[in-house]
Amino acid sequence: MQNTRRCISLICVTRQPPSLRATYGAVAAARCLHRAPPQSSRKKHETNVSTLFKPVQVQANVDCEDVGSELVGKLEKSELLKILNKFTQRRETKSLCSENGLDSYLQQQAFGSFRRYCIEAENLPVDLHIIFSDIMQGAGHIDDIFPYFLRHAKTVFPHLDCMDDLKKISDLRQPANWYTNARALTRKIVFHSGPTNSGKTYHAMERYLSAKTGVYCGPLKLLATEVYNKANERGTPCDLVTGEERKFGISDNSPANHVACTVEMTSVNTPYEVAVIDEIQQIRDPQRGWAWTRAFLGLIADEVHVCGEAGALELLQKICETTGETVEVRRYDRLTELTVEDSALGSLDNVMPGDCIVCFSKHDIYTVSREIEARGKEVAVIYGGLPPGTKLAQAAKFNDPANSCKVMVATDAIGMGLNLSIRRIIFYSLVKPTMNERGEREIDTISVSSALQIAGRAGRFRTQWEHGYVTAFKSEDLQTLQRILAQTPEPLKQAGLHPTADQIELYAYHLPNSSLSNLMDIFVNLCTVDDSLYFMCNIEDFKFLAEMIQHVPLPLRARYVFCCAPINRKMPFVCSMFLKIARQYSRNEPITFEFIKSNCGWPFKLPKTILDLVHLESVFDVMDLYRFMDLFPEAGNVREAQKELDEIIQQGVFQITRLLKNTEASQEGETPNYSMRRVTHVKEPRLPSASRGRLTDRLLAQGLLTPGMLSELRKEWDAQQVGQAAAASTSSKESQESPPDDSDDEDSYPGSYKKTRRKRRK
């Protein structure tokens, strides 16, 4: 009877796929290890990488008849469980698992799944049933189970069969080789190096306009639109390409030889005579740096002119060493004088015509604007969340010598994209929430590069204010500001990279049961990058959108496009509409202008409060989302509606002080300490030293802050927080209200302040 079982078992084994039969050789080798130490296994994957691979549910055996029981009898579940437990605890089993790519985490998951499969299945596959029966009868060896376990493990974790392929797909060590057409050329690389207001971009643009064909790649829609307008005004037909629209310089569907585009929309398949890449220092940006890297490596152009700060030169030269190209450097000096004043502003009473007060949060924008207008001075307001038309209107109002508006309050959104006639830049604060390369929010002093970029906006060439001035609002910030502006920007060390849609599609082919967010995590953790030149850009915003629409059935390519949408995830209404649009698209239902109108509250009304204004800004972003997707039929109608909405928002911003008053009036008796909290912030602004992290360490190292002073500041901070908490308890509705976002949409992160405060109390 035992010989019969052995013959049947052997027949079953020979009918297995070659990969499973080959595993028996490994099992045989393992039997020689009973009394010997295990052989060294291959290098294990990091635990955090293994945990990213989600187990696949294994389907039960589909055979209706229990052939195994008919041949060798039924299996006792209790005996079967003993065999499985013994199998999983064997040193030789674990050694074989390691040799086949299963680390401790994957072993645990696979053992558990295999055990449940064997115990809970009504009918086991006949060959596995016979193997278990032989072991129970003493005619088989427990290691005979391993080939079946390994087959099960590879079903649960499909990546075990394709790990080498996954690593090859995510090998990003030589991104220059991705662009074969660009590598086929011997490109002339010209770096126009200089500070703000030095004329570097002007000289690059002159070469662009004189070329037969050209492309301008800018960081903002405003800059691309400005180049588009100037080129056409000078008689050089030029098209405009941004994420939301395409405009033709000649006629519809008749492309011009020149293109002005945002850097993400740059074509790396079209040949040009001249390409201009503006603000090249953004190649280090944790979120968008990949777009500059792609443009610099991939543009098919005889001449590539890059403009930016001197700190980018060394990195560009190193990258060009990998492409066999050299960099010609043209240096420019600032065209106008810039003086750092010896005294701080001290009070808003000292604001003068031509002043621009730079804040790093919307809350500061609102409160400073109101305080200045309370002194009888009209204010222009610019921050990142405003539509482009509103920004331009506010800039024109401020620049017009005949206009009564002589003061501007803005965020660092003015650092790029707007021509402003500013006499003096005043830093209201030197502390800004930022995001590091790990995607963590932290509060730190503004960088040298950012400070120079903003300060350089003062004293523009050929304006009424050719001599620029810079100072701080608070006297305690002035010395720090002077020290920052006396430095040169640190050399850039790395350029950003990002997974492409093609790479993620290949990952999805190998891991069909993984979500898009999960695929991105696996890619980032498995990828290999040349750390001396490149880094992987932060993908948290992409993953946030991917997880939001994970339950919506969409093709992978469409899902990827949706997740690339430039959405501010701090705006609940925008996120809600994003989800609605994705659902509508997945059902193959038309996403029309009527759909947008019905969900966005058309027709629009003039805002009466700041909350109304913030909502209208969100609606504008939703319309941008509609046009960005390039998947929907009525983009033209939505664009016309955006123009109308832009004008309404402009009127709201022109009357921002009245909106603030209305907001406070509507909240009286409901959230009284909300206004109090805002006023307290203005009267007693946070000191830079109150933040934890690198800033505190830097001040301690420089001797500007002693441990004793730090201890006293912490006590004072804690006392203030206790006082605010006590005041907050007097309002029963405080927790039910949702006050306006306290940061600039594009440039700061309010959650960082709140998070830091909580840490401080601890």
UniProtKB/Swiss-Prot annotation:
Keywords: ATP-binding, Helicase, Hydrolase, Mitochondrion, Nucleotide-binding, Transit peptide. Residues 181-321 form the Helicase ATP-binding domain. Residues 716-762 are annotated as: Disordered. Residues 721-730 have a biased composition (Polar residues). InterPro entries: DEXQc_SUV3, Helicase_C-like, P-loop_NTPase, RNA-DNA_Helicase, Suv3_C_1, Suv3_DEXQc, Suv3_N. GO terms for molecular function: ATP binding; ATP hydrolysis activity; DNA binding; DNA helicase activity; RNA helicase activity. Its cofactor is Mg(2+); Mn(2+). Signal peptide: none annotated. Residues 739-748 have a biased composition (Acidic residues). Belongs to the helicase family. Major helicase player in mitochondrial RNA metabolism and maintenance. Likely component of the mitochondrial degradosome (mtEXO) complex, that degrades 3' overhang double-stranded RNA with a 3'-to-5' directionality in an ATP-dependent manner. ATPase and ATP-dependent multisubstrate helicase, able to unwind double-stranded (ds) DNA and RNA, and RNA/DNA heteroduplexes in the 5'-to-3' direction. Regulates mRNA stability and is required for the correct processing and maturation of mitochondrial transcripts. This is ATP-dependent RNA helicase SUV3 homolog, mitochondrial.
